[in-house]
Amino acid sequence: MTITKNKISLMLSSKLGFSNNLCEAIVNTVFSNILEIAKVQKLTLKNFGSFEVKQKTPRPGINFHTKSPVMIASKKNLRFTPSEKLKALINKSML
């Protein structure tokens, strides 16, 4: 199931009784702050998980069209690691 920021703001609006515009601004601010922090350092949200930027090293690859070897450039990836509590909650709900 995919959930959008708009759906999250609508859920907040209905649960908290705030206007949808206010909840949308809150959700956008939270996500942009998470992104800004995660770009610079590891971000851990207690009982949820951690966001961390990892640098992938350059590696050899193959161009599928020409079959010639190429070097794949290094790049940064955002990695999410769920907390043990979140994993337990997910596994509990699957039973």
Curated annotation (Swiss-Prot):
Keywords: DNA-binding
GO cellular component, one term: cytosol
SMART domains: BHL
Classification via InterPro entries: Hist_DNA-bd (IPR000119), IHF-like_DNA-bd_dom_sf (IPR010992)
Pfam family, one: Bac_DNA_binding
Example GO molecular function: DNA binding
Protein family: Belongs to the bacterial histone-like protein family.
Protein name, entry field: Histone-like DNA-binding protein
Organism of origin: Rickettsia prowazekii (strain Madrid E)
